[in-house]
A protein has these predicted regions:
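Active-site loop/helix belt of alpha/beta enzymes
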Residues: 2-5, 10-129, 136-137
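Functionally critical, mid-to-C-terminal surface segments that flank or help form catalytic/ligand
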Residues: 127-173
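Short beta-strand elements bearing conserved aromatic residues within extracellular beta-rich modules
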Residues: 175-177
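Helical hairpin unit composed of two closely spaced alpha helices linked by a short loop
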Residues: 179-182
Length: 183
């Protein structure tokens, strides 16, 4: 009979889901040890602010605190359970967070989550449709955080793609469009 494979989430400070205390961790560890139909295939956490390094480029104090909390809670479980905590930012800032594997995210698309000298380049192309065209005046702003200011009267277009589609807000005002063969 096959066992269901599960990954155990430890809440180290993001305050979403996961085990928060050593008591909770020990209870789950004991239950897993006795379970005949469940196998822990991994144990992990997620960092709330790993992509916000210190000014010198080092890992911020909150992320270090989360990493230490992970190690404390992780100690309640069998050491043979693979651990994975490093997201894209942690993979660049904290090699001590690699454990058994890392979970690259935004980096896979060619966008560095933190400042780096590594040669990142966008690795995908978006295809969408223009859903709205309008004219704006010089000085008007566009987008979240008013990131773009029109340098002159101009015609702009809204494209049907956004954060919900996986388009990262950090790419705002940096991408290029190709419309009817014109960049």
């Amino acid at each position: 009979q096959k066992k269901a494979q599960v990954h155990i989430k430890l809440d180290t400070g993001m305050n979403r889901i996961g085990l928060r205390t050593e008591d909770e961790a020990r209870q789950v560890a004991c239950a897993l040890a006795e379970a005949k139909n469940i196998k822990a295939a991994g144990i992990y956490t997620h960092f709330a602010a790993a992509d916000e390094p210190m000014e010198d480029g080092s890992l911020n104090a909150y992320s270090r605190q989360q990493l230490e909390r992970f190690k404390q809670l992780r100690a309640c479980f069998d050491e043979s359970i693979p651990a994975h905590v490093a997201n894209s930012a942690m993979s660049l800032l904290a090699p001590e967070a690699y454990f058994s594997m890392i979970r690259e995210g935004i980096s896979l698309y060619g966008y560095p989550p933190v400042k780096t000298d590594l040669p990142f380049a966008p690795a995908l192309t978006w295809r969408s449709e223009i859903v709205h065209i309008k004219n704006i005046s010089r000085g008007e702003t566009v987008g979240y955080g008013r990131i773009f200011t029109a340098p002159r009267d101009m015609r702009i277009a809204t494209v049907a793609v956004g954060h919900g589609d996986g388009y990262h807000r950090a790419a705002s005002n940096r991408g290029e469009m190709l419309v009817q063969g014109k960049r």
